[in-house]
Regions:
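Short hydrophobic segments within beta-strands
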Residues: 114, 171-173
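Residue-level signal for short, function-critical loop segments
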Residues: 19, 174-176
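Residues that mark the start of a beta-strand
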Residues: 165-169
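Glycine- and acidic-residue-enriched helix-capping/strand-helix junction motifs
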Residues: 125-130, 179-186
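Surface-exposed acidic, glycine/proline-enriched linker/cap segments
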Residues: 57-76, 141-164
Length: 186
């Protein structure tokens, strides 16, 4: 959201729609572009950075629209002018490296302010060894690991060696009711 003008019942909202470099009206979601993309160093944000993704990707399973997006910080064509593999293999002709951000203006009667949330910084709690041991994970990371569309396809594996653990310890509410300043007092 770039700008909001107006009053309850009559808001005019200016929205920036970031360039995805893929035409939403042409992309079929076939994923051939993802299979062929040579840039595979981007961390998969949706999977809590537990695995990598290609420079062109569909943000998450069942995304609406089910259309790929290109990460301009990872795409070799956008960074160096060389590559273009996804465009070559896109049978729908959906790849557009010249796409720019769009600004949309919409009218709304009401606005819901959803501020989101920020996960607690687990690194501040050294006693759990999160920074030192790959097999110490957060509940959100566990959720992605156990999800059928997650990085392990729902198989419970240790991140360090991809073997099944024999025992686990589940520590809940790390940082809640914390008065040291690292967590939340509530």
């Amino acid at each position: 959201v770039e700008e909001v003008k107006g009053f309850v019942g009559n808001f005019k909202v200016k929205i920036r729609k970031k360039a995805r470099f893929v035409d939403e009206t042409k992309c079929t979601g076939c994923k051939v572009c993802m299979e062929k993309c040579p840039s595979r160093k981007g961390l998969n944000e949706f999977n809590m950075n537990l695995n990598n993704r290609t420079a062109i990707y569909i943000p998450f399973a069942q995304a609406i629209p089910n259309v790929a997006v290109i990460d301009p910080t990872q795409c070799l064509k956008l960074k160096t002018g060389k590559c273009g593999v996804c465009q070559k293999f896109c049978g729908a002709g959906a790849i557009n490296y010249d796409m720019k951000d769009e600004f949309l203006e919409r009218e709304y009667g009401a606005i819901v302010v959803a501020t989101g949330f920020r996960p607690i910084n687990i690194d501040a709690f050294n006693e759990y060894g999160y920074s030192d041991n790959k097999d110490v994970i957060t509940s959100l990371e566990l959720e992605r690991i156990m999800n059928a569309a997650g990085p392990t396809k729902g198989h419970f594996e240790r991140p360090s060696d991809h073997t099944q653990p024999k025992k686990i310890v589940f520590v809940q509410c790390v940082g809640s009711r914390d008065t040291s300043g690292c967590g939340k007092e509530y």
